[in-house]
Amino acid sequence: MGKPVVAIVGRPNVGKSTIFNRIAGERISIVEDTPGVTRDRIYSSAEWLNYDFNLIDTGGIDIGDEPFLAQIRHQAEIAMDEADVIIFMVNGRDGVTSADEEVAKILYRTKKPVVLAVNKLDNPEMRSDVYDFYALGFGEPYPISGTHGLGLGDLLDAVAEHFKNLPDTQYDEQVVQFCLIGRPNVGKSSLVNAMLGEDRVIVSNIAGTTRDAVDTMFAYNQRDFVIVDTAGMRKKGKVYETTEKYSVLRALKAIDRSDVVAVVLDGEEGIIEQDKRIAGYAHEAGKAVVIVVNKWDAVEKDERTMKEFEQNIREHFQFLDYAPVLFMSALTKKRIHTLMPSIITASENHAMRVQTNILNDIIMDAVAMNPTPTHNGQRLKIYYATQVAIKPPSFVVFVNDPELMHFSYERFLENRIRDAFGFEGTPIKIFARARK
């Protein structure tokens, strides 16, 4: 199954971002005292008791200029829809407020587990204030202090207990799972429909792990594939259309469960900043990536247009220089046939293992071609290399001093490895370690 998702829900100014940063282990959100302040980044990976999970700060979801109670209602709705476990946060210094009760009423209706966190109880004398919060009806309240980090261990223990009971959707390892991500209206659903409309494709819908996620399984050229969360692509409704970050949240979950990510761009509108952010999620997750330019039928073009558009993509998506770029139209189905072969190639390269002796021949030839760098009179020495992981392919290069491995030389080695083995569509990782 994908990583569990934990959402932090609560009215403004109860300390959601402070707790988010404490659990995530880094200061990702902007923390201010102004109620309702919005944040740019609302998610992070975290770990507790050997569980990896995604943490969501719903306080970062801006619904716009709506009445206060409508905002927290929307916030709780999104958490209910996407989270596996909800941390309901209140301010222990304020006691139970009507706004807390409003959030609680909404959370009662969800079947998701809720853990109640009473924040801002910064010293032991204040802990007695926690008992008032039993009235909210979520069982034991956990006293915490985001400022000092007190009580977080007990809170996370309670959250992790619920991970054991989560449903698990496992597909056979031979089944390639992929998703289509992109901003609204780039044509993700239309692409799926165009793909599944081919005669060679046999389709069946599989219930996913979230309440309304549906994965679509199909056979292509006698192999099984799963398109992750086809329901998410079709999700409509006012709260979701007005909340860009809702679709980001959904895309994160789909990326996490996929082997290959197809990043869909709108050929008619061109590239915008949101496209780069969405593509960045796939790259950060270490997934294989294919870039799809949809609506190519609507673009006025000459013999240079496609090449210029691809150059523009390469300039904006330098971090995805390994990803193939495909041009197609879901409407006319032109070039749709190129998508599945590219996904298959990216998937196979993502899981590729190379022979150690051939790898080392490549590395030593590279060193002979371009000698290793020196720093303060000391030269980097490379002894040998080995592949340590797949999905994505990861390599350890054993050296005399890892500090001497400049990023530009690491990039040079990556390029030589790519020249030798291909690896189109997948990132590869290289780590320098000292030989013991």
UniProtKB/Swiss-Prot annotation:
Residues 352-436 form the KH-like domain. Residues 4-167, 176-351 form the EngA-type G domain. GTP 1 binds at residues 10-17, 57-61, 119-122. It holds the Pfam family KH_dom-like. Keywords: GTP-binding, Nucleotide-binding, Repeat, Ribosome biogenesis. It comes from the Bacteria. GO terms for molecular function: GTP binding; ribosome binding. Associates with the 50S ribosomal subunit. GTPase that plays an essential role in the late steps of ribosome biogenesis. Belongs to the TRAFAC class TrmE-Era-EngA-EngB-Septin-like GTPase superfamily. EngA (Der) GTPase family. NCBIfam families: GTPase_EngA, small_GTP. It comes from Bacillus pumilus (strain SAFR-032). This is GTPase Der. The keyword Transferase does not apply.
